[in-house]
A protein has these predicted regions:
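Short, well-ordered helical secondary-structure segments
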Residues: 3, 22, 56, 60, ...
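Generic secondary-structure transition motif, activating predominantly at the C-termini of alpha-helices
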Residues: 8, 12, 51, 89-93, ...
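Short amphipathic alpha-helical segments and helix-helix/interface helices
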Residues: 4-5, 44-45, 85, 102
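Charged, gly/pro-rich active-site loop segments
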Residues: 62-121
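Structural motif corresponding to alpha-helix initiation and N-cap regions
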Residues: 1, 40-41
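Solvent-exposed, well-ordered amphipathic alpha-helical segments
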Residues: 1, 19-21, 73-75
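Extreme N-terminal tail/first-helix region
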Residues: 1-14, 63
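Short beta-strand segments
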Residues: 9-39, 45-47, 53-57, 67-68
């Protein structure tokens, strides 16, 4: 998983294959990618209902495709995954309510863990 981890840590955005390719900001934490959707955050329609999604990471150097891989999708309990939610909040740029961000997510958004499948490089 070296290329995936390195790419996810270096780039602040990725592409998800949903109803159409969707750009999403994210955080890498504990071997997985975390994204937040809904409640005024980035719209990622249908992600939370999926079991799997294709993720494409781009190169921070030239913006080109670095690697694409399948990941399992799991909506996390935000209270039980507080460290991951904190890592994700730290990556949130230009939040209008940064002081109440985590509380707003808990009330109105879903935090989703994308775990690279074992066959991913």
């Amino acid at each position: 998983m070296g290329v995936i981890e390195e790419g996810a840590k270096k780039s602040g955005v990725l592409w998800l294959s949903l109803d159409r390719p969707r750009l999403a900001w994210h955080a890498w934490h504990d071997g997985a990618i975390y994204v937040v959707t809904g409640g005024g955050e980035q719209p990622l329609p249908g992600l939370a209902e999926r079991g799997e999604v294709q993720v494409t990471l781009r190169s921070k150097d030239n913006g080109g495709r670095l690697i694409a891989f399948d990941a399992t999708v799991e909506v996390v309990d935000q209270a039980e995954s507080a460290d991951a939610v904190a890592a994700l909040a730290k990556e949130r740029l230009n939040a209008v309510d940064s002081a109440g961000l985590v509380e707003r997510w808990a009330a109105r958004s879903q935090v989703v863990r994308l775990t690279p499948r074992e066959s991913a490089p």
